[in-house]
């Protein structure tokens, strides 16, 4: 995982200094992670999934999600008839979540919050046909902490709006190696993934997109 740290140190600082601000509080660093760093992260995620398998959770209304999910870190997000929440063990295996790779902690220190580490990394696996409807990330205890998102694999058509569901939205493509951040006025903005572009990357075995989102779920 040192390759990710080198990517940040050697070629990330210039990009970090000049993000693309899509809307106030939503910044994108296109191509921040080089291909070696991307491969290292995919390898770490898939190794973690052997301990905490991907699952297609159901919404609180009983509908299965098209996106398969797991997590890294001390907490993972889950959904069922009881609602949406963070838990300290995989809901199916009962085992603790795998550790978060140090490289992700390094990225958070630079782009997230240098004083308070993340306690959860949600791992979303999008295969062909999967999507994520517009939603807010509001299950965390303190929204002052950002959400840091890393795209790996196939390009996603990402959509972001405002803090109200009916606010106008705009879409952009997030490619493998792109990193983005929701912070401040955009922290509770509605956002989602309309679709992925199958075959736009060969990074993820079997095709698809892996999205990593670093969060601070509980109060510091």
UniProtKB/Swiss-Prot annotation:
Enzyme Commission designation: 1.14.11.33
Domain Fe2OG dioxygenase positions: 117-218
One annotated GO molecular function: ferrous iron binding
Single GO biological process annotation from the record: DNA repair
Residues that bind 2-oxoglutarate: 124-126, 209-215
Residues that bind substrate: 77, 84-86, 139, 165
Cofactor binding summary note: Binds 1 Fe(2+) ion per subunit.
Binding sites annotated in the UniProt record for Fe cation: 135, 137, 191
GO cellular component, one term: cytoplasm
Cofactor(s) listed: Fe(2+)
Catalyzed reactions per annotation: a methylated nucleobase within DNA + 2-oxoglutarate + O2 = a nucleobase within DNA + formaldehyde + succinate + CO2
Keywords, in A-Z order: Dioxygenase, DNA damage, DNA repair, Iron, Metal-binding, Oxidoreductase
Family per record: Belongs to the alkB family.
Function: Dioxygenase that repairs alkylated DNA and RNA containing 3-methylcytosine or 1-methyladenine by oxidative demethylation. Has highest activity towards 3-methylcytosine. Has lower activity towards alkylated DNA containing ethenoadenine, and no detectable activity towards 1-methylguanine or 3-methylthymine. Accepts double-stranded and single-stranded substrates. Requires molecular oxygen, alpha-ketoglutarate and iron. Provides extensive resistance to alkylating agents such as MMS and DMS (SN2 agents), but not to MMNG and MNU (SN1 agents).
PANTHER family on file: ALKYLATED DNA REPAIR PROTEIN ALKB-RELATED, NUCLEIC ACID DIOXYGENASE ALKBH1
Protein name as catalogued: Alpha-ketoglutarate-dependent dioxygenase AlkB homolog
Gene source species: Caulobacter vibrioides (strain NA1000 / CB15N) (Caulobacter crescentus)
Lineage: Bacteria, Pseudomonadati, Pseudomonadota, Alphaproteobacteria, Caulobacterales
